[in-house]
């Protein structure tokens, strides 16, 4: 295990700007409402236009959302917050308290795939079992990785092994590959994803409180407020890839709380949903093959807007953003659709935890365009994507849904 301590004096935790309130007693998410007209949500100021590739249409049009629904598949989960596929047709859903459950053939299996509630600290709204990633060769090596906060509130990125039973992991197989001290109970990030290069990417928030009081996001000697990139195959517990820009685990920086990131299955482009502070939520984007070292601006900027001032040159603005004045509070990054409905091909779907709104983002001949498509009743904690490219919605109150065409 590698552990990077933060030798910082703790202050009293005050996070009215930063901590998203979550329901304390979960109930089943109601079935979503999908009859909202496609009202465009403006982005101001307009981010720098990026030349389009692989667009669903040259005009940048969206499907009529009234012809689609988010179909409830299972309910009764305990505060689910992530969904991943292992390539077998099964879906794996994280419960914040420290369990991973299996969805198979449309049913939620009773037994947990993994139960590590004995080592997960989940008392804080942004703490718990937060991320899951299956190794690209999972079918051969049975390895998967999780990101959780431990009983001390610190981040643990750990590797586990499946048992001889494919529906049961071995909780005693844990190898902690990276531990990071957390100065506060919020902004833990939590996402894990394997990139097209085979490396493991991890999103970490800026350490919490409010306003990044220790300047972590802009400090390339500290892992907080970053996207990390680890080679988990070449050494134990991992190696730092030779082309990481700062000679350490950091790949990109200047992020507040990158709760969910994903790579487009077709183009390998990277999308980042970075949770904002008091005013703006943002989606960041990088072309496939982009080098490391991108500075996304926090806390000089919140979204594309000045926050602390004195911003240096070379910051990368988001390609989409929305204001809290529209009712939102916390962006949940999603996925680019690559499933069986061609009219959705190439559209990146993302949402907001508080409003339940779901937007589409596409690259057209005019650059990036976004539009609010669905008004749901779901506190959106995550999206998921299976091996066929279909997209799922995960709700804090216990439901999992799939985007489907109304017959």
Residues of each region from the PLM?
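Sec-dependent N-terminal signal peptides
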Residues: 1-22
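Acidic, Gly/Ser/Thr-rich repeat motifs that build Ca2+-stabilized beta-propeller blades
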Residues: 50-211, 260-263, 268-280, 327-366, ...
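Acidic/polar, solvent-exposed loop segments in beta-strand-rich repeat domains
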Residues: 210-222, 239, 291
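Loop-centered beta-sheet repeat module
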Residues: 222-230, 240-266
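Conserved blade-ending motifs and adjacent loop-strand segments that build the rim/top face
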Residues: 367-387
């Amino acid at each position: 295990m590698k552990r990077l301590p933060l030798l910082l004096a703790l202050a009293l935790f005050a996070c009215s700007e930063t901590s998203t309130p979550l329901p304390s007693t979960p109930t089943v998410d109601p079935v979503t409402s999908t009859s909202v007209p496609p009202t465009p949500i403006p982005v101001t100021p307009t981010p720098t236009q990026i030349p389009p590739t692989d667009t669903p249409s040259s005009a940048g049009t969206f499907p009529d959302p009234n012809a689609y629904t988010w179909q409830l598949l299972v309910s009764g989960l305990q505060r689910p917050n992530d969904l991943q596929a292992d390539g077998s047709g099964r879906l794996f859903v994280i419960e914040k308290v420290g369990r991973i459950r299996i969805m198979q053939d449309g049913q939620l299996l009773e037994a947990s795939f993994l139960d590590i509630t004995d080592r997960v600290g989940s008392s804080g709204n942004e703490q718990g079992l937060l991320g899951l990633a299956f190794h690209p060769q999972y079918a051969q090596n049975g390895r998967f990785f999780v990101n959780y906060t431990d009983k001390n509130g610190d981040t643990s990125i750990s590797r586990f092994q499946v048992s001889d039973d494919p529906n049961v992991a071995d909780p005693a197989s844990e190898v902690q590959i990276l531990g990071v001290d957390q100065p506060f109970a919020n902004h833990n990030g939590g996402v894990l994803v394997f990139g097209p290069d085979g490396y493991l990417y991890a999103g970490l928030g800026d350490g919490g409180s409010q306003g990044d009081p220790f300047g972590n996001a802009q400090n390339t000697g500290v892992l907080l407020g970053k996207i990390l990139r680890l080679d988990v195959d070449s050494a134990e517990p991992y190696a730092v890839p030779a082309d990481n820009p700062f000679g350490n685990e950091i790949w990109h920086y200047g992020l507040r709380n990158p709760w969910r990131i994903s790579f487009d299955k077709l183009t390998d482009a990277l999308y980042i949903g970075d949770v904002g502070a008091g005013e703006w939520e943002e989606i960041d984007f990088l072309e496939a093959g982009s080098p490391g070292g991108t500075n996304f601006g926090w806390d000089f900027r919140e979204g594309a807007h000045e926050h602390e001032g004195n911003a240096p040159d070379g910051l990368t603005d988001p390609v989409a953003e929305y204001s809290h004045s529209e009712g939102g509070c916390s962006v949940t990054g999603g996925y680019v659709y690559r499933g069986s409905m061609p009219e959705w091909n190439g559209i990146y779907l993302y949402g907001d935890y508080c409003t339940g709104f779901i937007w589409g983002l596409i690259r057209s001949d005019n650059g990036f365009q976004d539009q609010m498509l669905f008004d749901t009743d779901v506190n959106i904690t995550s999206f998921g994507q299976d091996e066929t490219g279909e997209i799922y919605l995960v709700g804090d109150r216990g439901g999992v849904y799939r985007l489907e065409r109304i017959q």
